[in-house]
């Protein structure tokens, strides 16, 4: 499977699992196209053209030839320079790693993380909140995240991957969409009445699927934080 096909598959499956309507997703893409058309010709080369067809700004091929054939992948929630080095060393020791995939974004995908948060406003609309109120509610939080990550060293991990020749991509919101869709379907099926009922449901799933870590669930399993 080629790198570009893995990337396209992630985006496609993310859209399929998105809790928003197809109309809402298309509307966000149209906003990006309108934004692009308004730019002076000289500035268009700086525009993230991938955002014209991919509604998830936190999911990108960060380094690597899109035509590269991929047979083995190292994937993790967080990928730092150390994991890129691990992939490089594994390849040198005979365990070839063709691609590293990070769930949490790096590079331009991290720099654009705030932009994908507009989907939260769409979801608020879907539960009956007025669009203007939803947009206003999210605007402050989106601005906070944008300012927080603006000065970050976005390219640190990507540069390490480039220097070592390790292909790298991130897949954030598409994966989160599947988690959200799973939870939505689960809650609709189980119909919990109290928050503690939700914990019981989640602990039951974790206990059955990860029996070897059941004793540790009280440390890092589901918890009520508020």
Could you tell me what each predicted segment is?
Residues 1-226:
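Hydrophobic structural segments
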